[in-house]
């Protein structure tokens, strides 16, 4: 039952010095402010999955003193968070480290007694995170179940009494009536000692993890045999999985990759265990493995791509009084975001600051944000990052901004047009590793050659902070001075190359040329929706050659989001959402940008790139986009669904909703029945049929909720997949958490077919 020892042995880490130090534990200084440093004991638990932290809170619970390795986003050495940068400058960097979590919770800033202790923690955690990520689905399942067994073994005798068995089933999120639990217990208790140990626990584990639906699927493919031959596997891949590359080569590679039995592998066969390993793997996922890498043409103009974009990136919470943080930029970049917003204002000591103007959100230094962007811009993707500047600074502080941009970003910053690219927007491929500024600019694309002098007066049209239309909102923000003119420093203007901010003056027409290719307008969600309603095709055609940025309405002071789908349907590229706010809008957003290797750029369909096209998302007619498909999805079962209530006795009642997002004609939703008291292996076996007419714009969202008859259902997990990335056949859908991180073991088992 020692899952930790199994983990260390599996990865050859049983004698690792760093991990032994973590298992022993150590006293560390926890830092919260300049006046709050407290010594606390931290220790890696034996399961190698959780960290125990000493707490002196009066209302502490055992659960509150633990955090999971799976919740860690990153471990940073030195003064590399706002907390340590502000409050631990007196301590050498080699003793400082930070644990950054995936969700919105605070970073854990720590000081070790010595550089060696800090190294043990940083290297040890890196090793566990790396090796946990490399575990296959079966290993994760085993590790998780063994961890639950260890928790249930209250007296730590490596045996399981009937009472401990009941606790174990609750840990697994399954409610079994006592008579059935007693029946399983007796079947496995071969020694008749009224407790399970060693092989008896293994027998119980096998009985628990047996999946009837996998047995049935395997029997369909193997007939009466105990294994699949290469020919049988090829037939399954062709007829059920609809794999384009189905053939002996693919079958043999799957056997080599997933078959655990060396005997079967040598005989070029796949056992049921190997079959399950394949179905749980990336090859058996409902999301196309080929689309997990960059596969699209990256050589087209920027305006031909959807761009993952964040609104008011600096905010961690609401738009009126929440905190601003450099961590928000890091989180967005790590999620593949390629367009960030910087709302710049004059700060004290001649240092520009970033915050949501006219509100009470906290303030951060412009230079600190640039350093965070420099360090993280290209960790998740090599393709260009666009910094959307909302500039409210005086000339003097604009020049400080320009100096910081030059000094901190250096050669990353694009500060002149690319050679030979002066008539159209460059491509993501041409701009790899580059950071572009979007903002006000004096003159045209090329340097003005002295025209206009060192500064000029231009109209500021993107003052989103002043767009607080609602009276209730206006009463809660600071008074906006009456000023609609901005004096722009030449030094800052010259750094804006291909993304010059302009007022939208209407679509181009004969005799009215409209915007230059390097000029772009921003639209509130409401204005964009009006343009789509009044001139859908005009907006689509405008977006073939020009970038358009969409941002949330001013009344969304709670940082809520609008649906990005309608904007994408109109060809809008920079559809900015509040990344800090989880919900269905961000689920769909993350699903769209999971495509093309999650690089932050997704090529628009051909009909949204045609300057003479006739597509209108609000008045759908026949055209090259019309490709009627019949989509059948059978939701068969769920696996290891997480608890939503921290109450240990609470078991989920899961239901699944399958949603279609796309053009209005394709939008649809279907629901399964509710399965009571079973989050471990619920069974639905329910089929849904959908008709989709514009598949290139459709996304499929699988939503799993805990049903509640008296209030709103609780979110359990979801996965959103572009229809063009959806694989056919028997597949596992790997569920994501509320914050967009993948659950380690939670899946749906489905069968998918897509026909013309």
UniProtKB/Swiss-Prot annotation:
What are the entry keywords?
A: Calcium, Disease variant, Glycoprotein, Hydrolase, Lipid degradation, Lipid metabolism, Metal-binding, Phosphoprotein, Repeat, Transducer
Pinpoint the C2 domain residues.
611-737
What is the recorded phenotype of mutating residue 434 to Q? Decreases on hydrolysis inositol phospholipids
* Gene Ontology CC: cytoplasm; extracellular exosome; plasma membrane
Indicate the segments forming the EF-hand domain, all copies: 140-175, 176-211
- Summarize where Ca(2+) 2 binds, as residue positions: 189, 191, 193, 195, 200
**What does the record say about how the cofactor binds?**
Binds 5 Ca(2+) ions per subunit. Two of the Ca(2+) ions are bound to the C2 domain.
UniProt domain PI-PLC Y-box: residue ranges:
492-609
Positions of the PH domain: 21-130
The EC number on file is 3.1.4.11
Q: Which domain of life is it from?
A: Eukaryota
Q: Which residues form the active site?
A: 311, 356
Task: Tell me the impact of changing residue 356 to L.
Answer: Abolishes hydrolysis inositol phospholipids. No effect on binding to phosphatidylinositol 4,5-bisphosphate
Amino-acid positions noted as binding Ca(2+) 3 in the UniProt annotation, renumbered to this chain: 312, 341, 343, 390
In this chain, where does the modification Phosphoserine occur? Answer: 460
The effect annotated for residue 338 to L is: Abolishes hydrolysis inositol phospholipids. No effect on binding to phosphatidylinositol 4,5-bisphosphate
Q: Which GO terms describe its biological process?
A: lipid catabolic process; phosphatidylinositol metabolic process; phospholipase C/protein kinase C signal transduction; phospholipid metabolic process
Q: Top-level EC class, please?
A: hydrolase
Q: Which PANTHER family match?
A: 1-PHOSPHATIDYLINOSITOL 4,5-BISPHOSPHATE PHOSPHODIESTERASE DELTA-1, PHOSPHOINOSITIDE-SPECIFIC PHOSPHOLIPASE C FAMILY PROTEIN
* Disease / disorder: Nail disorder, non-syndromic congenital, 3: A nail disorder characterized by a white appearance of the nail plate (true leukonychia), the nail bed (pseudoleukonychia), or neither (apparent leukonychia). Leukonychia may involve all of the nail (leukonychia totalis) or only part of the nail (leukonychia partialis), or can appear as one or more transverse bands (leukonychia striata) or white spots (leukonychia punctata).
What is its biological role?
The production of the second messenger molecules diacylglycerol (DAG) and inositol 1,4,5-trisphosphate (IP3) is mediated by activated phosphatidylinositol-specific phospholipase C enzymes. Essential for trophoblast and placental development. Binds phosphatidylinositol 4,5-bisphosphate.
Which named protein is this? 1-phosphatidylinositol 4,5-bisphosphate phosphodiesterase delta-1
This chain is encoded by the gene named PLCD1
């Amino acid at each position: 039952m020692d899952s930790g020892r199994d983990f260390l042995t599996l990865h050859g880490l049983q004698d690792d010095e760093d991990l032994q130090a973590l298992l022993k534990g150590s006293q560390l200084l926890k830092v919260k402010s300049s006046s709050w440093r407290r010594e606390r004991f931290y220790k890696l638990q034996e399961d190698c999955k959780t960290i125990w932290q000493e707490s002196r809170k009066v209302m502490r619970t055992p659960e509150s003193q633990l955090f999971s390795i799976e919740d860690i986003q990153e471990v940073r050495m030195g003064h590399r968070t706002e907390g340590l940068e502000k409050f631990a400058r007196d301590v050498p960097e080699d003793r400082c480290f930070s644990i950054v979590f995936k969700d919105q919770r605070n970073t854990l800033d720590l000081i070790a007694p010595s550089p060696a202790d800090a190294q043990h923690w940083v290297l040890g955690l890196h090793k566990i995170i790396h090796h946990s990520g490399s575990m296959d689905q079966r290993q994760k399942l085993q590790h998780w179940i063994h961890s639950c067994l260890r928790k249930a073994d209250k007296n730590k005798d490596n045996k399981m009494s009937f009472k401990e068995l009941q606790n174990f089933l609750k840990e697994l999120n399954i409610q079994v009536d006592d008579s059935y639990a007693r029946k399983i217990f007796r079947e496995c208790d071969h020694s008749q000692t009224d407790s399970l140990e060693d092989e008896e626990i293994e027998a119980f584990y096998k009985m628990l993890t047996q999946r009837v639906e996998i047995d049935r699927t395997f029997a369909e493919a193997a007939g009466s045999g105990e294994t699949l031959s290469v020919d049988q596997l090829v037939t399954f891949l062709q007829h059920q999985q609809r794999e384009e590359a189905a053939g002996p080569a693919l079958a043999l590679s799957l056997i080599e990759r997933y078959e655990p039995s060396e005997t079967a592998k040598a005989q070029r066969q796949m056992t049921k265990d190997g079959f399950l390993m394949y179905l749980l793997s990336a090859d058996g996922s409902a999301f196309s493995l080929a689309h997990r890498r960059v596969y699209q043409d990256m050589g087209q103009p920027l305006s031909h791509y959807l761009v993952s974009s964040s609104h008011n990136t600096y905010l961690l919470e609401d738009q009126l009084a929440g905190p601003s943080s450099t961590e928000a930029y890091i989180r967005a970049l790590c999620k593949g975001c390629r367009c960030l917003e910087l709302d710049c204002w004059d700060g004290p000591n001649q240092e520009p600051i970033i915050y949501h103007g006219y509100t009470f959100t906290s303030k951060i230094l412009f230079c600190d944000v640039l350093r965070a962007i420099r360090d993280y811009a290209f960790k998740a993707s090599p393709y260009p990052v666009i910094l959307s500047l909302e500039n409210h600074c005086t000339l003097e502080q604009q020049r400080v901004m320009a100096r910081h941009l030059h000094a901190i970003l250096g050669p990353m910053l694009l500060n002149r047009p690319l050679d030979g690219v002066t008539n159209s927007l460059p491509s993501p491929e041409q701009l790899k590793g580059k950071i572009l500024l979007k903002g006000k600019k004096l003159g045209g694309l090329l340097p003005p050659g002295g025209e206009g002098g060192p500064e000029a007066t231009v109209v500021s049209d993107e003052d989103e902070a002043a767009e607080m239309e609602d009276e209730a909102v206006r009463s809660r923000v600071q008074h906006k001075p009456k000023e609609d003119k901005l004096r722009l420093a030449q030094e800052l203007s010259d750094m804006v190359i291909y993304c010059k901010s302009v007022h939208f003056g209407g679509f181009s027409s004969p005799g009215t040329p409209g915007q230059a290719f390097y000029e772009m307008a921003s639209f509130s969600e409401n204005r964009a929706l009006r343009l789509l309603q009044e001139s859908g095709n005009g907006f689509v055609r405008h977006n073939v050659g020009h970038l358009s940025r969409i941002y949330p309405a001013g009344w969304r002071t709670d940082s809520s989001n609008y649906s990005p789908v309608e904007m994408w349907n109109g060809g809008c590229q920079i559809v900015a959402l509040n990344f800090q706010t989880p919900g269905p809008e961000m689920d769909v957003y993350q699903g769209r940008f999971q495509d093309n290797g999650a690089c932050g750029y997704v090529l628009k369909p051909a009909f949204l790139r045609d300057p003479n096209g006739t597509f209108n998302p609000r008045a759908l007619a026949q055209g090259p986009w019309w490709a009627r498909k019949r989509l059948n999805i059978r939701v068969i079962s769920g696996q290891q669904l997480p608890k939503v209530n921290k109450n240990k006795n609470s078991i989920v009642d899961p239901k699944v909703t399958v949603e279609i997002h796309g053009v209005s004609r394709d939008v649809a939703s279907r629901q399964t029945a509710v399965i009571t008291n079973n989050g471990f292996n619920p069974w639905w076996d329910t089929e849904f049929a959908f008709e989709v007419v514009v598949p290139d714009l459709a996304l499929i969202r699988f939503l799993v909720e805990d049903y509640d008859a008296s209030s709103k259902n609780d979110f359990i997990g979801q996965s959103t997949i572009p229809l063009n990335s959806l694989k056919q056949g028997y597949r596992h859908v790997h569920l994501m958490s509320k914050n967009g991180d993948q659950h380690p073991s939670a899946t749906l088992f489905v069968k998918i077919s897509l026909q013309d």
